[in-house]
Amino acid sequence: MASRGVASYRTEVWSDWCPGCGDFGILAAMQKAFAELNLDPAQTVVVSGIGCSSKTPHFINVNGVHTIHGRGIAFATGIKLANPQLKVIVNGGDGDLLGIGVAHFVALGRRNLDVTVLIHNNKVYGLTKGQASPTLRRGEKVKSLPVPNLQDAVNPIALAIASGYTFVARAYSLWVDHLKEILKAAINHKGSAVIDVLQPCVTYNDIYTAEFYKDRLYKLEDDPSWDPIVRDPSEDEEKKAAAIKKAEEWGTRIPVGVFYVNPLKDTYEERLAQRNPSYSIDNPPALQPISREDGSPIVGPDEFRKIFKRFIVNVKKL
């Protein structure tokens, strides 16, 4: 496969993100990561829900699916199961993925389906004028709120680990190269992967600004004693506990980097193939013919009756 440069993953679609938006850094990291991994655009799918972050598929020259609010992971699940050979990456905001879409977020972790999720975490609903998202802490009042937030915050790292994700990381949108390296590792990981990407919202969030993060963030990999990788099943509980404890750090010091990796767990598509002989990762449903050469369906009326014979009820007139 010929090597592709970063420019080949860019589109000519104009971005209407606010100047200074953290989404620009995430987009740049994705394009650079795709180029360094030399991903085939025809075999790569970027999926999103609704929100500022969910415009991302329009700006990357791969297959893009811009779906409905909170359902990006649900669509990505269908895409991956239909063709496990694809690289599938989900982009969504903290409101999109951890609010209305949180059930799908948890389900993806439980399944350990080989999909990568990027959470654009700016702690507000930017597209709808700055309401508090699930990651804004109780008592905090960003400039778009008339009163302080009444609800406690979701910790994306802790939730991901509890849900079963086997690659869990946090990054910062303005540290583009650091995010790029984490994203490459997440895409190469076999299993469900999530990156909680902290980012400023210059329009509505006057608390979590670039200035706020500048002197607080530190990289986990700078600590030589930090080892998030599970190399034996007996280590799993200890690694998870350490990751959750580290994820609770917030305030004067905020860790970014890889919190937890378990490469030992089989994926959902592998388990599905073992249980269902008709499901094949090498010959997935998306690549199987749905009609004969003459255009007629492979499963005609006679075959249909044979397959579903035990479900057919013959009703006799009295």
Curated annotation (Swiss-Prot):
Annotated keywords: Iron, Iron-sulfur, Magnesium, Metal-binding, Oxidoreductase, Thiamine pyrophosphate
Residues noted as binding [4Fe-4S] cluster in the record, renumbered to the chain: C18, C21, C52, C201
Cofactor note: Binds 1 [4Fe-4S] cluster per subunit. Binds 1 thiamine pyrophosphate per subunit.
Cofactor: [4Fe-4S] cluster; thiamine diphosphate; Mg(2+)
Pfam family name, one: PFO_beta_C
GO molecular function, one term: 4 iron, 4 sulfur cluster binding
Thermoactivity: Optimum temperature is 105 degrees Celsius.
EC number: 1.2.7.11
EC class of the enzyme, as a word: oxidoreductase
Record field: transmembrane: none
Binding site for Mg(2+): D94, N122, V124
Site residues by UniProt (Plays an important role in the binding of CoA): K129
Binding site for thiamine diphosphate: I50, G51, C52, S53, H69, G95, D96, G126, L127
Signal peptide: none
Reaction it catalyzes: a 2-oxocarboxylate + 2 oxidized [2Fe-2S]-[ferredoxin] + CoA = an acyl-CoA + 2 reduced [2Fe-2S]-[ferredoxin] + CO2 + H(+)
InterPro entries: 2-oxoacid:Fd_oxidored_beta, 2-oxoacid:Fd_oxidoreductase, OFOB, PFO_beta_C, THDP-binding, TPP_enzyme_TPP-bd
Function: Catalyzes the coenzyme A-dependent oxidative decarboxylation of different 2-oxoacids such as pyruvate, 2-oxobutyrate and glyoxylate to form their CoA derivatives.
NCBIfam families from the UniProt entry: Oxoac_fdxbeta_Archa, PorB_KorB
Quaternary structure and partners: Heterodimer composed of an alpha and a beta subunit.
Name of this chain's protein: 2-oxoacid:ferredoxin oxidoreductase 1, subunit beta
